[in-house]
Amino acid sequence: MAYAHRRLLHLFATALPLAAACGDDNGRDSASASATTLPSTTVPSTSDPTTATTTAGPTSTTDAPTEGTASASATDGGSTDGVSAGSSGGTSGGTTGPGTTGPMPCPEDQVVCDGNTAQVCDGMGGFKSETPCPKACAPGLGCVECEPGSAQCNGQVSQVCKEDGSGFVDTLECDPLQGMMCDPNNGLCTGACANLGGLSYIGCDYYPVVTQQLDFYVGPNNPYAVAVANTTADNATITVTKGGAPVLTDMVPANSVKAIPLPWVNELALGTGPSSVVPDGAYRLRSTQPVTVYQFNPLNADVTNDASLMLPVNTWTGNYVVAAWPFWNDFGGYPGWYSVTARYDNTKVTVQAAKGGTPTQAGAGVDGQGNGVVMLNEGDVLQVFSTFGGDGTGTFVAADKPVQVLGGHECTQVPFGITACDHLEESIFPFETLAREYIVVPPAQANGQAEKAVIVRIVAAEANTVLTFEPDQPVNKNLANVGDFVEIPTTTAKFVVKSDKKLLVAEYMVGQDAGYGTSDPAMVLAVPSEQFRTNYLFYAQPNWSANFVDIIAPAGANVMVDGAGVGNFTPIGATGFSLAHVALSNGGGGNHSVTADQKVGISVYGVLDYGSYWYPGGLDLALIPQ
């Protein structure tokens, strides 16, 4: 089906600073909602932008709308009572001038409304004509089918009147599986999931997706699973579907977390390539209350694990820069990969590898250098695999409708030559949410007495990127092209990286035989301080030898983990921030929380003998202007 949210795209392209500035501590933004935005070719429009939201990378001819930003708050185009904000009564529309005793005549041929009567001004204080309107009158338009910007319900679909008043167009699906309904009094979606208000990792609509894994770890003894954290005081009903077919229904109690195993999708998990599209490959998870979702591949503590923070649909865009890891040649070769999941039918996805190309397993419209165009339908998953000498890091993904992107590796050593290999995966943050400054810190070793080394990749999301480090790091500082990156080898350094352009920063935990304690490779994306939050609810599988939450907090912040104060912060240079490695109790069910009186950033990880996982514990996803 066609998709052209022109009004929404105009808002997105012109109001990024407002969207970034308006978020509160919960990432709330007055111009967003979680109700499903429906594709349409006739949404009211004041402009027809055709340029991409980013001009730094490979050119895209489509904006990347943040889904749901045409919200239930109806701040754009109409009031919440379904009456056009632009309508007015009266017979003139003029203004009182100097020396006059009444309103100035309206200009000749201007159309004004007197109630439901359209009047055409004669320029002399009278009217050329007066026409009773059978349905509605709109200033400047005259008789119309509906008042532009007004809303109504068509079943459980919220409709908005087009700008020319010619009729209503579907805009929002008030999804009952997200606890919503359409209110006939104002034509808008109601319910907890209709009023999220902001862009963050908290949402009601997610697409968990199985990723490439070693074949002999795919099976019922090592289940793929999602952990759902209910952030509200009400029970959340969870519905999982796949390709429109029901998979399961579950309930997550208020303010708690539940791990929910899901069947493996063998077409995505097994083998080592080639690049392909798996129709209906993704699960769709919907909740009647706002929740957060993490996926574990697999759930059980094992020697080839990782985990990903899932991003709700209302935060997806059409622009991403990929972080992955190079093809590993041992044991016949294991590929790095990235995946793209579509929310809507007929989604056009263009992928462009960094530096013009990288060795890639061709397939599904992607060539042997990692470039191509692929069409996806709702729930379809494109998986792109590297081959000998290839690395998908820096690939630019551009789509004409919102998509989800993950990156990682089937199983790899970090660095090469250091035992053992482990699965890598992480959700990639949209380009629009990336920042120019990141604090990079290493994780803790299992004993909590020392820190574990990482390899850090800093990827340019825009061309002509210049890096600075505090303290300095011995790497190239100039990145000429989108997707170029620098790699800081095995290090336990804590530092800040800054740029005048947007960056993506990925950290890779080194293998156990590197000599930094129990663990194996795992992958995480650094979260910029601009996207920090004051509260988090998350899950750490209690069967791991040790689980930690790392907290980056402003100096002097009061932070609680599971209700206990955190006091072991150490300053991170002269940044004004401090770091705490907090060991999590494995005595409960895996539910944990972080609260603070200032915004903080967290990452969560677990380690065992030759095994580990790592993911960002959460973040806001406010739109950060270029």
Regions found by a protein language model. Give the residues of each.
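Cysteine-rich, disulfide-bonded extracellular modules and peptides in secreted proteins
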Residues: 102-197
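Ser/Thr-rich, Pro/Gly/Ala-heavy low-complexity intrinsically disordered linkers and tails
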Residues: 19-106, 143
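Conserved functional hotspot residues at active sites or interaction interfaces
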Residues: 151, 190-235, 240-242, 247-394, ...
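Intrinsic-disorder/low-complexity regions
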Residues: 4, 23-28, 47, 62, ...
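Functionally engaged cysteine thiol sites
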Residues: 22, 32, 69, 73, ...
